[in-house]
């Protein structure tokens, strides 16, 4: 049987009040299947009709429709699960996470990959919110869900305890952000996440003598934990308010970082900073990456002003805003203390939204 043809006319969307009756039929089918298979995860009390109704009202209920018929249901939540705080085990980090609960597939669509497809759509919903932790739990006797979790690359993290002393296995996985091209063949850019801390730290640590000349923060970065703390401080901020840190990559190799800093959303202004490893310089990477972020900031994020600050002696860094049409507004005298103990003047450049329309 060709599953591709069967699922080609599917629509994934938020559940609506009009879907409730059909969803409840699917929940009943799922309960009956669990009973046949000897799983005790769901019973006559859970999930209740009122729970499904609340999912829909809060916007956490999602469905797959085949034509006009709902064939899969699940709840995608970002509100946290209280029992996860007392896990007998350990989560990778304490950043915001996404959970899928109450996943059920209509009998006529079973064995067609619908549950897996729902989970992958949930990952996309999470990416759009800038949340990259995915947590789930399931009963020890729910072999179907355990197989699904394993096929999606989740890692076991411990046990959680629900009502009635119901102990479940807990799992988590990292959802990696999508990568984007930015005008240089073979290179990509994406948001840096907690799991990148190790490779970022290693890259900085191996190039300390070079990077510390113009990047005073390097001397304060002493461990992977320091980098994890830095990334966490960004990732815990809601996506629409976040100063995103991006990795420039060639394949799976890090080339450098670029990102927004000190954004003032009330006045629609932000700042861009960047650094590149020595072996990737001179290829136009930073110029193209800064151009990419400028378009993102001015055309999509609602900023009106972008600022770049460069030490006067850092010729390569100054060349970036100059090349991209930034205006030099002036120089901050003794604007930064370098690692040699000397102050350096800082050139200040700006680009306004109206500048790119001229």
Label every PLM stretch briefly.
Residues 41-65, 221-241:
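Active-site rim helix/loop that mediates acceptor-substrate recognition in acyltransferases
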Residues 75-104, 110, 268:
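Conserved acyl-donor/pantetheine-binding loop and adjacent beta-alpha core of acyl/acetyltransferases
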Residues 1-8, 16-39, 43-44, 50-53, ...:
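A short, well-structured alpha-helix characteristic of acyl/acetyltransferase catalytic modules
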Residues 15, 103-105, 138, 276:
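Hydrophobic adenine-recognition pocket in adenosine-nucleotide-binding enzymes
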Residues 116, 124-133, 141-144, 160-161, ...:
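Acyl-donor (CoA/ACP) binding surface of acyl/acetyltransferases
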Residues 63, 69-78, 99, 104, ...:
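Conserved beta-strand in the GNAT
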Residues 22-25, 51, 117, 121, ...:
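Alpha-helical elements of Rossmann-like donor-binding domains used by nucleotide-donor carbohydrate transfer enzymes
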């Amino acid at each position: 049987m060709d599953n591709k043809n069967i699922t080609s006319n599917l629509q994934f969307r938020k559940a609506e009040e009009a879907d409730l009756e059909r969803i409840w039929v699917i929940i009943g089918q799922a309960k009956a299947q669990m009973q046949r298979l000897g799983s005790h995860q769901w019973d006559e009390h859970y999930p209740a009709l009122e729970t499904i109704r609340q999912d829909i009202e809060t916007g956490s209920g999602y469905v797959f429709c085949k034509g006009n018929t709902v064939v899969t249901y699940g709840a995608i939540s970002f509100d946290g699960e209280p029992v996860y705080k007392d896990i007998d085990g350990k989560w990778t980090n304490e950043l915001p996470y996404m959970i899928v609960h109450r996943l059920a597939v209509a009998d006529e669509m079973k064995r067609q990959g619908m549950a897996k497809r729902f989970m992958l759509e949930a990952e996309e919903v999470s990416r759009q919110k800038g949340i990259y932790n995915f947590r789930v739990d399931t009963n020890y006797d729910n072999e179907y869900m355990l197989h699904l979790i394993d096929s999606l690359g989740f890692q076991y993290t411990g046990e959680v305890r629900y009502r009635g002393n119901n102990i479940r296995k807990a799992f988590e996985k990292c959802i990696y952000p999508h990568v984007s091209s930015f005008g240089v063949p073979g290179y990509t850019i994406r948001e840096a996440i907690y799991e990148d801390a190790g490779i970022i730290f290693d890259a900085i640590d191996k190039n300390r003598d070079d990077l510390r000349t113009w990047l005073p923060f390097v001397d304060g970065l002493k461990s992977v934990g320091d980098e994890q703390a830095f990334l966490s401080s960004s990732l815990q901020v809601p996506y629409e308010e976040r100063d995103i840190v991006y990795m420039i990559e060639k394949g799976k190799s890090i080339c450098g970082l670029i990102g927004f800093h000190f954004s003032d959303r009330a006045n629609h202004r932000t700042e861009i900073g960047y650094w590149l490893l020595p072996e990737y310089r001179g290829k136009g990477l930073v110029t193209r990456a800064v151009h990419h972020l400028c378009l993102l900031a001015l055309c999509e994020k609602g900023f009106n002003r972008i600022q770049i600050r460069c030490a006067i002696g850092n010729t390569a860094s100054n060349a970036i805003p100059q090349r991209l049409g930034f205006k030099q507004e002036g120089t901050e005298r003794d604007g930064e203390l370098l690692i040699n103990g000397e102050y350096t003047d800082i050139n200040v450049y700006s680009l306004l939204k109206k500048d790119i329309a001229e």
